[in-house]
């Protein structure tokens, strides 16, 4: 991307949290920032130093006493002249200042993610760094925080840049063979020196792309489904683990028909727990649809909690190949050891055995938090572009009969796909979709 792209509008937005609050931060960015400060804040403050000042309306009415910071271009978040107004966080105060800014000629309210979009367009960050910033803001667990910070570092850029340099070197070797095939000091065959490295590179890209599921679990959560017969106590277990009433609990079989979800933070890892419809021969079409959804969700889960009522055992089938924790519920109602073998005996009603169950869940999900320090593709678009890069390399490797010119073109297409991941190559059509996921003011 170019070092700096001129943008005509000056934008502003509330960048801090919901109101009322102790402090509210309004961010301004664009060419008119200096004019705004001169009129509304009594002049420019020293760059990057906080200045206590009155904030004025156009009629010179004092709207608030605030801290003002000025960040001149290009040494700012967006690469443009920027300012921050740290106001008292009352709704009326913030509304008055925002209304005054909206009336200022040349200013408009920022769109979602527009400050970060300008930072990208002005070369202050690449596209994966912007996506990582969005993840950092949304992080709910320690693993998500660590993963977002790793993705916002330059380690990913170094990895992809290294791959692109290898492709550039390979293309240079091929071009040399094409242009100087008759010269004695040029290697006799590009295939002997180039294509073996290209095979290794393709394998590295494929293995990297295949690690996306690890990133997906860190970002979106380790997916757990509670599966069992009607009245096994699935909804009661969901409520007990969530420590709040999420699901309706009744003695009537088939109460749960839609899938209910709750997110938990277990030892720094996000875990998404889903309560599903009881598995049985359905009494009606609506319940049958719920059971169908339950089985489909179990097939997509990372872990199945197979729950059984020890006083009335009935075990549904579990999708093959899925990790399963077998749980005997209502253990408070029996005195003898149940005939069936369970990984854990609990009572969702009294809390008996829940600590042991949480230990088992933690053991099943713990390994994924260790991946938070790795460089992994963390968006579906990354995986798609990595796939395009690998496919182009495969076409070049297998294209011994198509000529070196076309094989070199395959390497160029692979390099372009890698460049699109970080936004170095033609990604204008993606920008609105990516930055619209940010909050206003970021």
From Swiss-Prot:
Keyword field contains Oxidoreductase: no
Biological-process GO terms, alphabetical: tRNA methylation; tRNA wobble uridine modification
Residues the record lists as binding (6S)-5-formyl-5,6,7,8-tetrahydrofolate: 27, 84, 124, 442
Required cofactor(s): K(+)
CDD domains for this protein: trmE, TrmE_N
Enzymatic class: hydrolase
Keywords associated with the record: Cytoplasm, GTP-binding, Hydrolase, Magnesium, Metal-binding, Nucleotide-binding, Potassium, tRNA processing
GO MF entry, a single one: metal ion binding
Places the protein is found: Cytoplasm
UniProt binding sites for GTP: 231-236, 250-256, 275-278, 329-332
Gene Ontology CC terms: cytoplasm
The enzyme's E.C. designation: 3.6.-.-
Chain sites annotated for binding Mg(2+): 235, 256
Domain TrmE-type G span(s) in chain numbering: 221-366
Pfam families: MMR_HSR1, MnmE_helical, TrmE_N
Cofactor: how bound: Binds 1 potassium ion per subunit.
Gene3D superfamilies on file: P-loop containing nucleotide triphosphate hydrolases (3.40.50.300), Probable tRNA modification gtpase trme, domain 1 (3.30.1360.120), tRNA modification GTPase MnmE domain 2 (1.20.120.430)
Function: Exhibits a very high intrinsic GTPase hydrolysis rate. Involved in the addition of a carboxymethylaminomethyl (cmnm) group at the wobble position (U34) of certain tRNAs, forming tRNA-cmnm(5)s(2)U34.
NCBIfam families, alphabetized: mnmE_trmE_thdF, PRK05291.1-3, small_GTP
Family affiliation: Belongs to the TRAFAC class TrmE-Era-EngA-EngB-Septin-like GTPase superfamily. TrmE GTPase family.
Assembly and binders: Homodimer. Heterotetramer of two MnmE and two MnmG subunits.
Protein name as it appears in the record: tRNA modification GTPase MnmE
Native organism: Chelativorans sp. (strain BNC1)
Taxonomic lineage of the native organism: Bacteria, Pseudomonadati, Pseudomonadota, Alphaproteobacteria, Hyphomicrobiales
């Amino acid at each position: 991307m170019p070092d700096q792209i001129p943008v005509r509008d000056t934008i502003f937005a509330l960048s801090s949290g919901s109101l009322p609050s102790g402090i509210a931060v309004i961010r301004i960015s664009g060419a008119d920032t200096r004019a705004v400060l001169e009129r509304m804040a009594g002049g420019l403050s020293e760059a990057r130093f906080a200045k206590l000042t009155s904030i004025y309306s156009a009629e010179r009415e004092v709207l608030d006493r605030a801290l003002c910071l000025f960040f001149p271009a290009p040494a700012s978040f967006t690469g443009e002249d920027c300012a921050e107004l740290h106001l008292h966080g009352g709704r009326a105060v913030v509304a008055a200042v925002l209304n005054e800014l909206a009336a200022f000629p040349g200013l408009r309210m920022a769109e979602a993610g527009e400050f970060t979009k300008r930072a990208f367009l002005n070369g202050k960050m690449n596209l994966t760094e912007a996506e990582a910033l969005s993840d950092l803001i949304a992080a709910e667990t320690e693993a998500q925080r660590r993963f977002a910070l790793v993705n916002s570092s330059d380690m990913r850029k170094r990895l992809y840049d290294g791959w692109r340099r290898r492709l550039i070197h390979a293309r240079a070797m091929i071009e040399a063979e094409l242009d100087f095939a008759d010269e004695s000091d040029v290697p006799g065959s590009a295939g002997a020196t180039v294509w073996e490295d290209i095979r290794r590179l393709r394998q590295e890209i494929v293995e990297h792309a295949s690690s996306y599921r690890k990133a997906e679990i860190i970002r979106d959560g380790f997916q757990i489904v509670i599966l069992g017969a009607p009245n096994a106590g699935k909804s009661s277990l969901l409520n007990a683990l969530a420590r709040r009433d999420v699901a309706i609990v009744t003695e009537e079989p088939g109460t749960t028909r839609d899938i209910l979800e709750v997110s938990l933070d277990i030892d720094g890892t996000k875990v998404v727990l889903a309560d599903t419809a009881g598995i049985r021969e359905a009494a009606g079409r609506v319940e049958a649809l719920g059971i169908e959804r339950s089985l489909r969700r179990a097939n997509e889960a990372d872990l199945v909690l197979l729950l059984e009522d020890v006083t009335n055992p009935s075990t549904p089938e579990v999708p093959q190949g899925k990790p399963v924790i077998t749980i005997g519920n209502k253990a408070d109602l029996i005195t003898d050891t149940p005939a069936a073998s369970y990984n854990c005996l609990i009572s969702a009603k009294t809390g008996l055995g829940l600590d042991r169950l949480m230990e088992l869940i933690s053991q099943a999900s713990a390994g994924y938090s260790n991946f938070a320090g790795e460089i992994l593709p963390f968006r579906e678009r990354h995986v798609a572009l990595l796939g395009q890069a690998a496919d182009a390399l495969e076409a070049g490797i297998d294209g011994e009969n198509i000529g070196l010119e076309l094989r070199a073109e395959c390497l160029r297409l692979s390099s372009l796909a890698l460049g699109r991941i970080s936004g170095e190559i033609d990604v204008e059509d993606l920008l609105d979709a990516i930055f619209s996921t940010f909050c206003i003011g970021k």
